[in-house]
Amino acid sequence: MFMINLFLLIIPILLAMAFLTLAERKILGYMQLRKGPNVVGPHGMIQPFADAMKLFIKEPLRPLTSSSSLYTIAPTLALTIALVTWIPLPLPYPLINMNMGLLFILATSSLAVYSILWSGWASNSKYALIGALRAVAQTISYEFTLAIILLSLLLMNGSFTLSTLITTQEYLWLIIPSWPLAMMWFISTLAETNRAPFDLTEGESELVSGFNVEYAAGPFALFFMAEYTNIIMMNALTTTLFLGALYNLHMPETYTTSFAIKTLLLTILFLWVRASYPRFRYDQLMHLLWKNFLPLTLALCMWYVSLPVLASCIPPQA
């Protein structure tokens, strides 16, 4: 039964990821006053499957100087970690109801750095290595703010379990009392998933293609799939944390519908940001975190810690 549930979780995620690639090309196309893919199938709807077929039937080339084992493992590890991160998410019921679901997500998203680092180092290319080192520095840096923002939300939630966030937000979304955290969280998720304007790891002008420059065919497709799966996962987590969906015990499908719509809107916002903003310079990227986000998130975390203590000093009102 567990394996059936696992496949029922993985298959829709992969389908959503496939159509996200199409949605991105369509949205970018319309924002640049062109059509986007419109040949393969009605309105280009079968384009993702054509792309997948083309990539997976090509011969996967491997550089002679590369480290074969790590070079081969890295793409598979990237996609596996991206899919494993979905396990504790309530949709409205998680695959495994973990007591420390948020810590699990934070830990698995940290592991994604290893696949990028291994791919950059094992490729034995200076462009790939620089891209990988950039990705590691960027991801580790922005995980500081993500962790502190999560800690602040947990103080309001009172539990590490994601399912309790549904109950916490029954009457009020957490985005309303903590909108500065929500803004910093959204920008940090852009950096965490290496998306524009923080896609320094794939800087075409200086690094050709970044950490995956030596990859082709199937292994390249696995990295591509991992990136887009992470985007949907981060937006799903944002919805769970800040935009708690309506939950009815007798009609759980209302939660799923509301959850899917909010996640879709956040994902479109990701694509809109990519179409609108130029890439940050690397020093600006680091200054944004260490000089702006980190002090702000620490101050807000202290505020949320001290608020219950201050409130307890107020005498009861008649």
From Swiss-Prot:
It is found in: Mitochondrion inner membrane. Keywords: Electron transport, Membrane, Mitochondrion, Mitochondrion inner membrane, NAD, Respiratory chain, Translocase, Transmembrane, Transmembrane helix, Transport, Ubiquinone. One of its GO terms (cellular component) is mitochondrial inner membrane. GO terms for biological process: mitochondrial electron transport, NADH to ubiquinone; mitochondrial respiratory chain complex I assembly. Its EC number is 7.1.1.2. The keyword Glycoprotein does not apply. The keyword Mitochondrion applies. One of its GO terms (molecular function) is NADH dehydrogenase (ubiquinone) activity. Pfam families: NADHdh (PF00146). It is an enzyme of class 7 (translocase). It is a multi-pass membrane protein. The chain crosses the membrane at residues 2-22, 76-96, 102-122, 146-166, 171-191, 217-237, 253-273, 294-314. It catalyses: a ubiquinone + NADH + 5 H(+)(in) = a ubiquinol + NAD(+) + 4 H(+)(out). Disulfide bonds: none annotated. InterPro entries: NADH_UbQ_OxRdtase_su1/FPO, NADH_UbQ_OxRdtase_su1_CS. Core subunit of the mitochondrial membrane respiratory chain NADH dehydrogenase (Complex I) which catalyzes electron transfer from NADH through the respiratory chain, using ubiquinone as an electron acceptor. Essential for the catalytic activity and assembly of complex I. Belongs to the complex I subunit 1 family. Core subunit of respiratory chain NADH dehydrogenase (Complex I) which is composed of 45 different subunits. PANTHER family: NADH DEHYDROGENASE SUBUNIT 1, NADH-UBIQUINONE OXIDOREDUCTASE CHAIN 1. This is NADH-ubiquinone oxidoreductase chain 1. The gene is MT-ND1.
